[in-house]
Amino acid sequence: MKKQYVTLTVNGREYRFSIGDGFGQVPPSETLSQTLRKRLQLTGSKESCSEGACGCCTVLMDGKGVTSCMLLTVDCDGKDIVTIEGLEDPEKGLDAFQCGYCTPGIIMAAKALLLENPHPTGDEIKEAMSGNYCRCISHYTVLRAINRVAGNEEDHLAVMHRANDDVENPIPVRQELFLSPYANGTNSDHSLD
């Protein structure tokens, strides 16, 4: 029997959507990112590459970081989803970002890491954040902020300098991110709101 409804718990609130191609229904081809942004007006998570490569659309699903542009809403039935809007009491005063476009995805990826491993090493943080791209090159300040939140006793400047020790790839970032047609933020379907 074909599913007629999809039920999601988003930021602690339950939503039930009718599945179909009619007005007000969630089409079977609609991504979780589209549902969150268009239907629930949760625009904190961004959709930049639409390929799961940049991490801007990261949300937590059942406590794990996922790229919401790669998941169909109909496949998320019964899942518990937390968006950037659902996080409370954010750490303040670390000034890790510049333009802010990547911020929601990076924060959600960092939250997923810290849920899984509350005290990651600097190298574990670098690896966990390798799927998120910051086009303002704020990677070092992001790593420093996550190290601080994780309670690492390491000197945060040393962590930043060690990131440069590997000259071939100072911070692991997927190279295909630089080929994205949306990297400059000018595609009208991917607004900054």
Stretch-by-stretch model annotation:
Residues 1-193:
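Signature of N-terminal electron-transfer/Fe-S-associated modules in redox systems
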